[in-house]
């Protein structure tokens, strides 16, 4: 969610809000100013016309449900354009299509193999080995599909795929 007064993004938890805005620079280092879903140009600069949204790949509505993953974990956060996140025909609280799960896996493995500072956090949250992490993501996807039923994908690819 976005706090208009403070100008930051946050996630609601049973114990309060978690500010996820601070993850933008790290995520953008991988996404290279491209929306995770449609590859349109996005910016992490405040008040920018194309200001990105920090989006939960697996929607935050899964909190408190029969879902194995920590939804607010960095492994589950991506940068998206406004249209993909909550525009007309946007993702909102839907589950991204299965093809996008492979993109999330690839992104997480990039952070791990590049020895990015997020490496240890992603390993702790998703598993020690490539197989464990892939199994974890698939389990999360299967659980989310049962709960959410409907899947979503971007209307069109707007930029050149870069990841």
Outline where the language-model segments fall.
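Short, charged surface segments at domain edges that flank catalytic/cofactor-binding sites
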Residues: 1-43, 61-71
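A boundary/linker detector
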Residues: 1-21, 42, 128-163
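Histidine-centered nuclease catalytic patch
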Residues: 39-77, 90-104
């Amino acid at each position: 969610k976005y706090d208009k007064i403070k100008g930051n993004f946050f996630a609601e938890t049973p114990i309060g809000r978690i500010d996820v805005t601070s993850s933008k620079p790290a995520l953008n280092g991988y996404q290279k100013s491209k929306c995770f879903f449609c590859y349109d140009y996005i910016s992490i600069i405040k008040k920018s016309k194309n200001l990105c949204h920090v989006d939960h790949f697996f929607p935050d509505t899964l909190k408190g449900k029969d879902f194995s993953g920590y939804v607010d974990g960095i492994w589950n956060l991506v940068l998206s354009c406004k249209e993909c996140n909550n525009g007309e025909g946007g993702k909102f609280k839907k589950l991204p299509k299965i093809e996008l799960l492979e993109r999330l896996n690839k992104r997480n493995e990039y952070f791990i193999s590049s020895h990015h500072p997020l490496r240890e956090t992603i390993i702790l949250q998703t598993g020690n080995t490539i197989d464990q992490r892939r199994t974890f993501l698939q389990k999360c996807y299967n659980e989310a599909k049962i709960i959410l039923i409907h899947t979503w994908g971007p209307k069109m690819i707007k930029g050149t795929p870069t990841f």
